[in-house]
UniProtKB/Swiss-Prot annotation:
Top-level EC class as recorded in UniProt: hydrolase
Gene: Pdp2
Domain PPM-type phosphatase: 107-518
Cofactor(s) required for function per UniProt: Mg(2+)
Keyword set, alphabetical order: Hydrolase, Magnesium, Manganese, Metal-binding, Mitochondrion, Protein phosphatase, Transit peptide
Protein name: [Pyruvate dehydrogenase [acetyl-transferring]]-phosphatase 2, mitochondrial
Catalytic activity: O-phospho-L-seryl-[pyruvate dehydrogenase E1 alpha subunit] + H2O = L-seryl-[pyruvate dehydrogenase E1 alpha subunit] + phosphate
Organism: Mus musculus (Mouse)
Localization terms from the record: Mitochondrion
Length: 532
């Protein structure tokens, strides 16, 4: 590979910010706290997206303060082989085939594939997949953290439990309460489908369970025999978890580890996009700028994209109107500054970020209680024009879609993917990948494989000229997101260069990228539809 591209990217990034040499390190003149911004790079691929769903009308310069911790100007002529590039891209990938049945009918989810590529260190994105034991509904979530990973980690671990409890019948909730009261094992709530690389906080699970119990006690008081509807459950779960995150840091906590972790969770933030699939019923809840789309194949074979979410940011006209309705007219000009909420945050909805939700007095009182704020990765000041909080909400927008045979796959991803690729680009890439892999790969579970069959399939693939660099669809999307030029063409040199950027430089060119592709079982969907 030519080193020209990687050398140009490094020098371009370095020249964006005036640097001062200090000892044997390089420092930026700009403020070094990247938490003042949740920046997003902009790709021309997004220009076709509607403004009403929150996509920017044009590009803007990336502004990211960083400290380059290397010694002098290094020789940045790094070279990766295609095999090394693929190894880096595939390090976080995962795939899972769903074998569950519901009343004798195979699950409407056939399989799902995911991957994650970090730009931050440590990565601030999280993901989650679980089956609700009581309802057999499957839940998929993408959680994009900012100001650190603590909030995204907490939401990824806890949100599905709130959702599962919300859907429980009154009788099941009574059984949960009785078991807890008598110190007996709880009924199974979730069946997690974890990736080996998923991290788990174990130190504060008892605190979390206490708050979850308070929630199901309140649900018991409502005396709803069948539990909340799925839409209600999603709305309640998002807002209740965010409220508990806020309350946990206000309550006195004796344990220092728990106290400081709760502080980090509350003062960092996370956007979230969550899908719940049960038979033909697909619900998607979104708060922030993660995104979910459906890939649809019409009867004539043509493919189209069906967006299921809208980005909650400064380019979403409906979101701007909501903010203006919730605050005095005198603040109309200061709600959004430089395309950010109060000039600080890109998304207008998120978990955590209590510094955009609490009053100034409450913030001062909480932070004055002896917390360890030295290492806390939070905003160091209250934004200007902070008059009528809260300015930020975790209330999601919920979309319902009844699955049809033509609905083939669902893509959920953090904004790191959508910064680089438009909705239609993603569908096109998934379909192209299916034509290269899915239609030419024997399904060993469906028919016996022998050498003759394998040879026939290999000859078919060779004759058609089709091949794929990746078996995992999410990996395929990430490869094209960071390796394609402005014309959508893959450039191996660009791809390798983007993967060899130092951590502090990489964040100027791309965000953490987390992608999940859920494939539906068309035959099962047909069966569910016939059964009504």
């Amino acid at each position: 590979m030519s080193s020209t591209v990687s050398y140009w990217i490094f020098n371009s990034a370095r020249n964006r910010i005036a640097l001062l040499r200090g000892g044997r390190r390089l420092y930026s003149r700009a403020a070094t706290s990247r938490n003042l911004l949740k920046w997003r790079p902009f790709s021309p691929a997004l220009a076709s997206s509607a403004l009403k769903c929150g996509s920017p009308p044009g590009g803007f310069a990336l502004r990211k303060a960083y400290r380059h911790t290397s010694t002098e100007e290094e020789d940045f002529h790094l070279q990766l082989s295609p095999e090394q590039v693929s190894d880096l891209l595939r390090a976080g990938e995962s795939s899972h085939k769903v074998l569950d049945f519901n009343n004798g009918v195979p699950n409407s989810v056939l399989r799902f594939e995911s991957n994650q590529l970090a730009a931050n260190s440590p990565v601030e994105d999280r993901q989650g997949v679980a089956t609700c034991v009581q309802t057999n509904g499957m839940m998929f979530g993408i959680f994009d953290g900012h100001g650190g990973h603590a909030c995204a980690q907490a939401v990824s671990e806890r949100l599905f439990y709130y959702m599962a409890v919300s859907l429980m019948s009154h009788q099941t909730l009574e059984q949960m309460e009785e078991a807890t009261e008598n110190m007996k094992p709880l009924l199974p709530i979730l069946r997690w489908l974890k990736h080996p690389g998923d991290s788990i906080y174990k130190d504060v699970t008892s605190v979390h369970l206490d708050h979850l119990r308070v929630y199901w006690q309140e649900l018991l008081d409502l005396h709803m025999e069948m539990g909340l509807s799925i839409e209600e459950a999603l709305m309640y779960s998002f807002q209740r978890l965010d409220s508990d995150i806020s309350l946990e840091i206000q309550a006195p906590l004796e344990d220092e580890v728990t106290r400081n972790l709760s502080l980090q969770v509350a003062f960092s933030g996370a956007t979230a996009c969550m899908a719940h699939v049960n038979g033909v019923h697909l619900h998607v809840a979104n708060a922030g700028d993660c995104r979910a789309i459906l890939g649809v194949q019409e009867e004539n074979g043509a493919w189209s994209c069906l967006p299921l979410t809208c980005d909650h940011n400064a380019w979403n006209e409906a979101e701007l109107s909501r903010l203006k309705r919730e605050h005095p007219e005198s603040e109309d000009r200061t709600l959004i500054i430089d395309d950010r909420l109060l000039g600080v945050l890109m998304p207008c909805r998120a978990f955590g970020d209590v510094q955009l939700k609490w009053s100034k007095e409450l913030q001062r009182n909480v932070l004055a209680r002896g917390f360890d704020t030295e290492a806390l990765n939070i905003y160091q000041f209250t934004p200007p024009h902070y008059y009528t909080p809260p300015y930020l909400t975790a209330k999601p927008e919920v979309t319902y879609h009844r699955l049809r045979r033509q609905d083939k796959f669902l893509v959920l991803a953090s904004d790191g993917l959508w910064d680089m690729l438009g909705n239609e680009d993603v569908v096109r890439l998934v379909v192209g990948h299916l034509s290269k892999v899915g239609r030419h790969k024997p399904d060993l579970d469906q028919r016996p494989a022998n050498l003759g069959l394998m040879q026939s399939l290999l000859l078919q693939r060779k004759a058609s000229g089709l091949h794929a660099a990746d078996q995992n669809t999410a990996t395929h999307l990430i490869r094209h997101a960071i390796g394609s030029n402005e014309y959508g063409e893959m450039e191996p040199e660009r791809l390798a260069a983007m993967l060899t950027l130092p951590e502090d430089v990489a964040r100027m060119y791309r965000d953490d990228i987390t992608v999940m592709v859920v494939f539906f079982n068309s035959d099962s969907i047909d069966t569910y539809c016939k059964e009504g």
